[in-house]
């Protein structure tokens, strides 16, 4: 199956299925000499793992990572880094009723028509379970970006269903299971999810991600633009149906006199472009928003067809996230970090010695 690798110089190839013995990834292109332990990776995996609150899937996976290669005496060697996460709480019997039937909104039908075979247990390869290795690889990327350039990649939930979550402070994000930057909204989010679970339904979410400290110059026009690669990576996350960079779709209603970010000796006056111009980073914060659709696995009976093309009714059982967006923040952060480290290495390879006489201005004039 092709399409399992992300990146050009810093590559990540994932493997495994939701109910297989293990999942994992192979990272190639990581620079040598960086300190790296399983604890460095585990801290990020623990932010994404299931079973952490009543609002997410109750599948109990420890998601304990094993570093199989690429690290010697706690230091990266420059050779491929293999990460392994063993599946320990599969419950395949929950999927016995969909062996011959396609679940609406899932990849069951498309995988079957493309490959002529599918692993029906938890969605197999198409499961969001496969985002765990992405978060593991993202931990490596985050560490290198932070230590080498001071880049910080952080995210938060900015909307759940009809509820907007206004940003208050980053310190709130780690204090609740929603990654909400506004502690005052958390009780409303909890009540909303409790009612949704009783209804046997699901809902979508919006996640915002910000990368600060990114230098000017990263990105490869025309077809490997930084924002294009970010959009591709974000759309590779399960259930993501929309991506915005900067002002995004709000740009439609903005006039050029408003949208164009003016430059002054003191810095940029605005950041409607989201930190990217011409596919190249400006030195400002890179701002990304993603829209995540409602979970397709719900208890409400829905119409579908069987492999024979006959009408069928599907009721989904098993342990599922009523809103996959609740655990998506560390995944989106990881995807952004993976794109950034790849472009950092590509920039260093081609333009690392380039210097200009023009001062690098601040990301914000204020």
From Swiss-Prot:
GO MF term list: chorismate synthase activity; FMN binding
Cofactor binding: number and manner: Reduced FMN (FMNH(2)).
UniProt catalytic activity: 5-O-(1-carboxyvinyl)-3-phosphoshikimate = chorismate + phosphate
UniProt-annotated binding residues for FMN: 125-127, 238-239, 278, 293-297, 319
Annotated metabolic or biological route of this protein: Metabolic intermediate biosynthesis; chorismate biosynthesis; chorismate from D-erythrose 4-phosphate and phosphoenolpyruvate: step 7/7
Binding locations of NADP(+): 48, 54
A GO-annotated cellular component: cytosol
EC numbers, comma separated: 4.2.3.5
CDD domains noted in UniProt: Chorismate_synthase
Gene Ontology BP annotations: amino acid biosynthetic process; aromatic amino acid family biosynthetic process; chorismate biosynthetic process
Matching Pfam families: Chorismate_synt (PF01264)
EC category name: lyase
Record HAMAP family: Chorismate_synth (MF_00300)
NCBIfam families found in the cross-reference section: aroC, PRK05382.1
Function of the protein: This reaction introduces a second double bond into the aromatic ring system.
Family per record: Belongs to the chorismate synthase family.
Subunit record text: Homotetramer.
Stated name of the protein: Chorismate synthase
Source species of the chain: Burkholderia cenocepacia (strain HI2424)
Top-level taxonomy: Bacteria, Pseudomonadati, Pseudomonadota, Betaproteobacteria, Burkholderiales
């Amino acid at each position: 199956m092709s399409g399992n690798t992300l990146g050009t110089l810093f590559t990540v190839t994932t493997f495994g299925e939701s109910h297989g013995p293990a999942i994992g990834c192979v990272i190639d292109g990581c620079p040598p000499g960086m300190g790296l332990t399983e604890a460095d990776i585990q801290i990020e995996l623990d932010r994404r793992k299931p079973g952490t609150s009543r609002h997410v899937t109750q599948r109990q996976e420890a998601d304990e990572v094993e570093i199989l290669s690429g690290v010697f005496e706690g230091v990266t060697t420059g050779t491929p880094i293999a990460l392994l996460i063993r599946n320990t709480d599969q419950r395949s019997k929950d999927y016995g009723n969909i062996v011959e039937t396609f679940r609406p909104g899932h990849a069951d039908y498309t995988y079957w028509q493309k490959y002529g075979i599918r692993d029906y247990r938890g969605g197999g390869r198409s499961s969001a379970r496969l985002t765990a290795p992405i978060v593991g690889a993202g931990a490596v990327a985050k560490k290198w970006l932070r230590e080498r350039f001071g880049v910080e990649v952080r995210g938060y939930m900015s909307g759940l269903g009809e509820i907007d979550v206004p940003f208050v402070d980053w310190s709130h994000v780690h204090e609740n299971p929603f990654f909400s930057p506004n502690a005052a909204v958390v009780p409303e989010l909890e009540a909303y999810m409790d009612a949704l679970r009783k209804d046997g339904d699901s809902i979508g979410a919006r996640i915002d991600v910000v990368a600060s400290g990114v230098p000017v110059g990263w990105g490869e026009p025309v077809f490997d633009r930084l924002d294009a690669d970010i959009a591709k990576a974000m759309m590779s996350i399960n259930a993501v149906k929309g991506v915005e960079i900067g002002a995004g779709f709000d740009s439609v209603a903005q006039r050029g006199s408003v949208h164009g970010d003016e430059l002054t000796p003191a810095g940029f006056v605005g950041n409607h472009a989201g930190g990217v111009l011409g596919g190249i980073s400006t030195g400002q914060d890179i701002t990304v928003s993603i829209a995540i659709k409602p979970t397709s696995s719900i208890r409400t009976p829905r119409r579908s067809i069987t492999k024979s093309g006959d009408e069928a009714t599907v009721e989904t059982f098993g342990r599922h996230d009523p809103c996959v967006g609740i655990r998506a923040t560390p995944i989106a952060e990881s995807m952004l970090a993976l794109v950034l480290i790849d472009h950092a290495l590509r920039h260093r390879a081609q333009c690392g010695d380039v210097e200009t006489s023009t001062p690098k201005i601040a990301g914000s004039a204020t």
